[in-house]
Amino acid sequence: MTAQSKNYRKAASAIDRDRLYAPLEAVRLAKAGASTKFDSTVEVAFRLGVDPRKADQMVRGTVNLPHGTGKTARVLVFAVGERAEQARAAGADEVGGDELIEKVAGGYVDFDAAVATPDLMGKVGRLGRVLGPRGLMPNPRTGTVTMDVAKAVEEIKGGKIDFRVDKHANLHVVVGKASFDETALVENYASVLDEVLRLKPSSSKGRYIVKATLSTTMGPGIPLDASKTRNLTGEDAA
């Protein structure tokens, strides 16, 4: 048995599959079972009671994690002229117009988020085959199609992330790193949960959050009690 599988089995043995854990409890279990070889990413996964095939039940949005993701995002900006200079000044990793569009069309995707000015979306829109499946296509709804490219870059670098339910009604969102303290992870999770709840489609009937699970990279899933939305870090939170 490999060391990795031993660590997984040990972490999994500490989880009671017949109960739902309060967020603080789940975070403690996740941190305790995280790999010591690298700083694991901590992620929450929701199974939603929606039908993503219906346009009015597509859950998509953005959230500003109060403690960031633990990773400095690489941001690419499609802009020219003054807006391009503003993007560079704000810390964008790559900025450009036609040449950058051609580079991405050729398969270049070494970035975590893309921003575009509205005037270039006619050309950027043709990159759907490359950007769409990776969730990287700029979109007005997530604030990534904008003339204020500097603000968009700063927000993404500061911990703003976007999320979108997949075709199986699953939603995966990063809430930080295992090295974060408990409070930071719980507060990041709370921000994600609040936004997911706010985005509940009016046409979605019945149970909205069917299942919620917290996990680390290569770690076991920990069943979450998503009904807990208040006092998540207080003395009686666990």
Swiss-Prot record:
InterPro entries in the cross-refs: Ribosom_uL1_bac-type, Ribosomal_uL1, Ribosomal_uL1-like, Ribosomal_uL1/biogenesis, Ribosomal_uL1_3-a/b-sand, Ribosomal_uL1_CS
Protein's recorded name: Large ribosomal subunit protein uL1
GO CC, alphabetical: large ribosomal subunit
Name of the gene encoding the protein in the UniProt record: rplA
Subunit description: Part of the 50S ribosomal subunit.
Keyword Cell cycle annotated: no
Function: Binds directly to 23S rRNA. The L1 stalk is quite mobile in the ribosome, and is involved in E site tRNA release. Protein L1 is also a translational repressor protein, it controls the translation of the L11 operon by binding to its mRNA.
HAMAP family: Ribosomal_uL1_B
Biological process annotations from GO: regulation of translation; translation
A single GO molecular function term of this UniProt record: tRNA binding
Annotated keywords: Repressor, Ribonucleoprotein, Ribosomal protein, RNA-binding, rRNA-binding, Translation regulation, tRNA-binding
Alphabetical list of PANTHER family matching this protein: 54S RIBOSOMAL PROTEIN L1, MITOCHONDRIAL, LARGE RIBOSOMAL SUBUNIT PROTEIN UL1M
Family: Belongs to the universal ribosomal protein uL1 family.
